[in-house]
């Protein structure tokens, strides 16, 4: 397991630095972030991503079901919570209370490394559309399932498994046998098998975006993910544009997609 996955304060700082340097500018260049705008992050974890957007002048809400990560966010974002710039909520995003409270409220919604963990991604993206103001934006970043570490195997305690690419593409039965053979924790194995079920490809994501009433405003595919700059001192590299046009093949060499999509008005015909 990489140290960043066990040291949550380090993970928080790395998320903050990466978001401030790469993601805030990615959004701001296409959708000007102004003081008074409100942002919602789904699966906010420890809050490093959300903090970067608040430092850009926004106010925000972070929602996470994971109690341990939520408690860390409360600790790490204490000053922001006290001065009213951030509200943290430890609830299911589908709760009727939040649905009413969040209706057409936000200028921007963020799902950073969250979508690939969600069952029924079509339902979630369509549901979150109702939380956006007219012409509001949603930023999503996720690793396509077929990329070298699309199974999140870097979380494995075995150094060999954490650095070995593509084996998450094995049939489920063989994948499970391999994880057990290296004595991975039962809870981690269950989490990795869940990710195998919730896998998402670039093709399916693009279809969902269109079907759920959004248009793509900006998109960037990365060969070397920006996170690796601070983790491994590797400079980010964008995916070759030609390879990026080839369906299926691009999923095997795209480490992450940055996607900014806009809510479209529904027209009655």
Give the residues covered by each predicted segment.
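Conserved N-terminal segment of class I S-adenosyl-L-methionine
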Residues: 1-104, 108, 252-269
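Poly-acidic low-complexity segments
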Residues: 11, 97, 120, 161-162
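Short glycine-/acidic-enriched loop or helix-start segments at secondary-structure transitions
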Residues: 51, 72, 120-121, 149-151
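A short beta-strand submotif of the Rossmann-like class I SAM-dependent methyltransferase core
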Residues: 111-112
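Histidine-centered divalent metal-coordination motifs
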Residues: 117
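S-adenosyl-L-methionine-dependent methyltransferase catalytic module, highlighting the catalytic core
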Residues: 122-130, 137-262
